[in-house]
Amino acid sequence: MAAERGAGQQQSQEMMEVDRRVESEESGDEEGKKHGGGGIVANLSEQSLKDGVDRGAEDPEEEHELAVDMETINLDRDAEDVDLTHYRIGKIEGLEVLKKVKSLCLRQNLIKCIENLEELQSLRELDLYDNQIKKIENLEALTELEVLDISFNMLRNIEGIDKLTQLKKLFLVNNKINKIENISNLHQLQMLELGSNRIRAIENIDTLTNLESLFLGKNKITKLQNLDALTNLTVLSVQSNRLAKIEGLQSLVNLRELYLSNNGIEVIEGLENNNKLTMLDIASNRIKKIENISHLTELQEFWMNDNLLESWSDLDELKGARSLETVYLERNPLQKDPQYRRKVMLALPSVRQIDATYVRF
């Protein structure tokens, strides 16, 4: 989630440009969720496959692809990892022969309904990312399921998963969900990704005491609230919402990464108990002053670009963070100073990257 570090590479150059790798909006690490190509156990004729075009990049109006009949797909009955990504499958059927399957990937197909999975009692991971599903249903029998991804579909409600009590990771990114609900039984949940939906309030998550990562970016949330029970939370992302104040984080004593960029925050506050923070992203807000963070001595990354910072003396607030390596301060008024980079280096000698450029000493 942090900008990639390249210290020691190309040392003959005075400095080198690197891409800022922004924390996911809210997909988390999609590559990490993909099932490896080595697990592909199905074969399909070339005529039935679509050549290398990502369906997510297509015109959304084009939904006229002909669905493939699953009877044309040869399945390995003994496979534990089945990857049927981009097979143009229109209906889930014929999978009951997979008596040993633990991971089933049905990404980027034409599936409209979750069905005919009740025989897959051994299933641990189910990936339905990028289909045309409008309702979560028919999953009650999959009581051993640990990972469920129904991102990039057409869901309006969170439902039909209250029996999945072994679930550890739930991805419902980029749907049309407007309320967090019906997940109170998921006590084992460690990661919840609800980014790019229509959620207006943080609610109904107080029973998720094992939650470690919560992604709520790109929603319509106006207040940080109802987080007190999540004492194991280490990553919280509420970027690109409608927040005006940093609050409600006092119980998150184990929080290490906090992403609040692209909101309407005016003051840095409310972080008194978050001493373990290593990453703080408050970019693209309305903040005029760095304050109330001198106690965050474990900070490694501080992103405050695109704000209203004017005073160089504010950087003194970061001097206690001896491990601080990366700062983003570009597009603040103080960047107009011709000695901008030099002054940042002098104020924060531990820093190895200023904005998108590495520093070489």
Curated annotation (Swiss-Prot):
Residues 1-64 are annotated as: Disordered. Residues 17-34, 48-58 have a biased composition (Basic and acidic residues). One of its GO terms (biological process) is chromosome segregation. It is found in: Nucleus. Keywords: Acetylation, Leucine-rich repeat, Nucleus, Phosphoprotein, Repeat. Its main location: nucleus. Gene3D superfamilies: Ribonuclease Inhibitor. The modification N-acetylalanine is found at residue 2. GO terms for cellular component: chromosome; nucleus. GO terms for molecular function: protein phosphatase regulator activity. The modification Phosphoserine is found at residues 12, 24, 27, 45, 48, 323. Residues 332-361 form the LRRCT domain. Widely expressed with high level in testis. Expression increases during puberty. Expressed in spermatids and probably also in spermatozoa. LRR repeats lie at residues 78-99, 100-121, 122-143, 144-165, 166-187, 188-209, 210-231, 232-253, 254-275, 276-297, 298-319. Transmembrane segments: none annotated. Coiled coil: none annotated. Belongs to the SDS22 family. Interacts with PPP1CA, PPP1CB and PPP1CC/PPP1G. Regulatory subunit of protein phosphatase 1. This is Protein phosphatase 1 regulatory subunit 7. It comes from Mus musculus. The gene is Ppp1r7.
